[in-house]
Amino acid sequence: MYSCLSGGLGNQMFQYAAAYILQRKLKQRSLVLDDSYFLDCSNRDTRRRFELNQFNICYDRLTTSKEKKEISIIRHVNRYRLPLFVTNSIFGVLLKKNYLPEAKFYEFLNNCKLQVKNGYCLFSYFQDATLIDSHRDMILPLFQINEDLLNLCNDLHIYKKVICENANTTSLHIRRGDYITNPHASKFHGVLPMDYYEKAIRYIEDVQGEQVIIVFSDDVKWAENTFANQPNYYVVNNSECEYSAIDMFLMSKCKNNIIANSTYSWWGAWLNTFEDKIVVSPRKWFAGNNKSKLTMDSWINL
């Protein structure tokens, strides 16, 4: 089983989870992660790096230059959106694997009589709340941060003295960064208006009372200036930390969550294990008419 990774930590988690679910279904021994995207990503994409090593999960990685070169060719071919039989033929010749895009993934997952021949190579984002939540007991243990990062978190003032010592904490994630600076990301996603966050805070406080707001953003200076005079607001500044999973862990430990149109804070909220949590998510995830499968029935969509 191959999983071709791309994107930031949130996207990598969706891709790994989908591959893991299918691996268990097919009873395959190994799950091989292809990280060649991070060495040769498209110019229009935001530069990312492999980050799944921040969790206690098991995987193999492509090791030979031959395999990496072959996958790199496949990635370039896949950008042209060729007919499935053409792409599958290329996969078969180069990798001796079956190409498995998202649409075919669900057919295979739901086929109880599926016969495994050459194995499969998953190639999509798999951003599907229903898929992940229907396998919650399987997926939740996978994305627990490793011991080294847990020790770092336990030493953070924002965790020890703010999140752990306040019963009513709400994480608030504002994604700016590449949604502003990268034309492709800006056109596809767009930045949520502040009105969304104001409505979300009002909703949670109407239900659960006054909250301590823990602000997370990839534009820390902007966040610090924006919330400088707000009582009970704390802006998390881990900008010099190279581990994205730390802020995600902190989000998950807040009582409630207000997420951005970002898979990163989606996972922060999903990993939250408070039974009476309130999660507020954007009703409109993408700019234009693109539809999302990331909404959860139990979350409040504004």
UniProtKB/Swiss-Prot annotation:
GO biological process: fucosylation; O antigen biosynthetic process; protein glycosylation
Pathway: Bacterial outer membrane biogenesis; LPS O-antigen biosynthesis
CDD domains, sorted: Fut1_Fut2_like
GO terms of molecular function: galactoside 2-alpha-L-fucosyltransferase activity
EC nos: 2.4.1.308
Annotated Pfam families: Glyco_transf_11
Alphabetical list of InterPro entries matching this protein: Glyco_trans_11 (IPR002516)
One cellular component (GO) term of this entry: membrane
Superkingdom as given in the UniProt entry: Bacteria
Record field: catalytic activity: beta-D-Gal-(1->3)-alpha-D-GalNAc-(1->3)-alpha-D-GalNAc-di-trans,octa-cis-undecaprenyl diphosphate + GDP-beta-L-fucose = alpha-L-Fuc-(1->2)-beta-D-Gal-(1->3)-alpha-D-GalNAc-(1->3)-alpha-D-GalNAc-di-trans,octa-cis-undecaprenyl diphosphate + GDP + H(+)
Keywords: Glycosyltransferase, Lipopolysaccharide biosynthesis, Transferase
General remark: O86:H2 and O86:B7 subtypes share the same O unit, but the O units are polymerized from different terminal sugars in different glycosidic linkages.
Function: Involved in the assembly of the O-repeating unit during O-antigen biosynthesis.
Assigned protein family: Belongs to the glycosyltransferase 11 family.
Protein name (record): O-antigen biosynthesis glycosyltransferase WbnK
Gene of this entry: wbnK
